[in-house]
Amino acid sequence: MTTESLLIELLTEELPPKSLVKLGNAFATLIADSLKQQYLTTPDTVSTVFASPRRLAVHLTAISVQAPDQIVTLKLMPVAVGLDAQGQPTPALHKKLAALGVENVAVSALKRVQEGKAEMLFLEQSVTGILLAAGLQKAVDEAIRQLPVAKMMTYQLDDGWENVHFIRPAHGLIALHGQQIVPISALGFAAGNTTRGHRFEAKQAELVIDHADHYEYILETEGTVIPGFDRRRSRIREGLETATRAAQLQCIEDAALLDEVTALVERPNVLMGTFSADFLEVPQECLISTMKINQKYFPLLDADGKLTNRFLIVSNITPADPGQIIAGNERVIRSRLADAKFFFDHDRKRTLASRLPDLDKVIYHHQLGSQGERTRYVRALAQIIGQLLDNGDLPAQANQAAMLAKADLLTDMVGEFPELQGIMGRYYAQREGVDETIAFAIEDHYKPRFAGDALPRSMTGICVALADKLETLISLFSIGQFPTGDKDPYALRRHALGVIRILIEKDLPIGLDVLISRAAGVLRDEISGEQGPESSHARPVTPQLTEQLQDFFYDRLASSLRDQGYTVQEVESVLNLRPSLLCEIPRRLAAVRAFTALPEAASLAAANKRVSNILKKSEFDATVSIDKACLQAPAEIALYRALSEIESDARHAFQKGDYVTALQMLAALKAPIDAFFDQVMVNDENEVLRRNRLALLAALQATMNRVADISRLAA
């Protein structure tokens, strides 16, 4: 059957720029998948996605004009139900065949197939392949209905009577199979072969696409539009790099901004603008946020990473003289930067400390009270963490940093740019003469903000960051705000990973259970028997809740370790022991990986699993100790001696943190363990012997599982 390329384009008003890539890919994928399910594609079909500010399109090669005929097998019913004793069709079978429109089919044409204990009747039918027009209509309808759109617009067609629901008003539809228009319709438009190019620079208002394969070429040459998202993105990146090299400056890397700008322009043109150097007195983060968020500009830095008074504009038009475009953008940015300077100057009229009483008026959560209350909890917890880490000045510094950490939430600058919280607090604190350690801790207590972000720079920042994240987790858990599925509105998974990263990467000797217990103590107002911060909101923190929070931490840790390349077995072997000191986990994992390379590893892991199962089934009393006088069989005596020889050294190696040695010493136990299980009956009829052998196995398990539960490594 002959094939041709297929082109589908939806011409619309400007689409949401932050959703364009997702929309374009979804539109193309949904159409291609639907056509494939209807057998209209071929093995040679290749899909090309086009997504520009005003169009979603897909080009598919090798699409059939009609799907091949298909043999369809339908299960009808059991033979016992469909045929009587004489082999004639029953009323039930007649009714079923009539419903399928094949009431005249002969019984001999039906197939009998044994399925389990029942013999079933099947009907084979030849189904004529669907025509492209019908299949494409179904595919386009499904694609429009299933696009990942959070909120649809409702608008009326030209007749003023019919309502249409789509992400933005549509203006046209192309459906071309080779040169032929495919007769489908969507969003109130019948398919044609015409589209529109650039709003201002197209050579003609209406473009005729004479063949599906000529779409991209005609749009670029006649319509002055680059329809492919990736090509536009590459063109913008090249323009940014060229302009940056010419100015001998650096452009800030921002993939999200580059994607957004790519979704805003049809034909990019990179230009350079400037602003008054006087604005550089404002912290550069403020100016950068203004340029990137409000204006979609690319700020330029000098060789030292300092912001300059130059920036790059991505224009959607390419005039012979770009002077007016540059001047217009410079006027706009001047106003924006003046606003930022005003915010900065106005904020500095009040100290951070003077803003603290106002935090009591800011709601943190309607069930948890105000930011002022929260600040008092975080201060108490930060001070405790400081005491756990250092009895010197750290607790007092952590207390002061936590006290000021949220004050910048009340500033005009953070109100305008919430992403600057913490950063502005640091700047304002420095301008007030606050100690540098405290100032940087104000900024750092939000870290890490995202995967791969830097950690707090000082121990003071670490104390406040841990306290802030733990307070968030335990408070929200206490009111039942748990992450579910893909929903995590309070970023609790990110907060947990932040705590985990700080404990591990900063090698902090604080147990996770201790941190959670002390955090729970603060929220229960039971810090060492003293009354904690007063609260107008009850926060019921129960032992079950703290256990649930620990489970949450270990689940996040397991997921993170798997993402880092550790196997499921390696992760389970270590985390099954619930090590409290998370800073030890990388060393334990390294020891487990070294252990698995030993020739004896597989046998020892299997034996450990066997020991674990025996002890579990026997409900062994762990308080029972080994009685050497009751050791009778040569194999059990040999195992006891081998275990005694390595136990002390293995324990000392474990206590020193030499986990590799502690595990590798177990290799000496392979032969005596194998002999024990070959020659000794553990569940002896003699109760004294049985309990003594179980005690020996319990001691063996305790020695083998100090670093990790190696039974988890068994195949």
UniProtKB/Swiss-Prot annotation:
Its EC number is 6.1.1.14. Tetramer of two alpha and two beta subunits. The gene is glyS. The keyword Cytoplasm applies. SMART domains: DALR_1 (SM00836). Belongs to the class-II aminoacyl-tRNA synthetase family. GO terms for molecular function: arginine-tRNA ligase activity; ATP binding; glycine-tRNA ligase activity. Keywords: Aminoacyl-tRNA synthetase, ATP-binding, Cytoplasm, Ligase, Nucleotide-binding, Protein biosynthesis. GO terms for biological process: arginyl-tRNA aminoacylation; glycyl-tRNA aminoacylation. It catalyses: tRNA(Gly) + glycine + ATP = glycyl-tRNA(Gly) + AMP + diphosphate. GO terms for cellular component: cytosol. PANTHER family: GLYCINE--TRNA LIGASE, CHLOROPLASTIC_MITOCHONDRIAL 2, GLYCYL-TRNA SYNTHETASE. It comes from Nitrosomonas eutropha (strain DSM 101675 / C91 / Nm57). Its main location: cytoplasm. InterPro entries: DALR_anticod-bd, Gly-tRNA-synth_bsu, Gly-tRNA-synth_heterodimer. This is Glycine--tRNA ligase beta subunit. HAMAP family: Gly_tRNA_synth_beta (MF_00255).
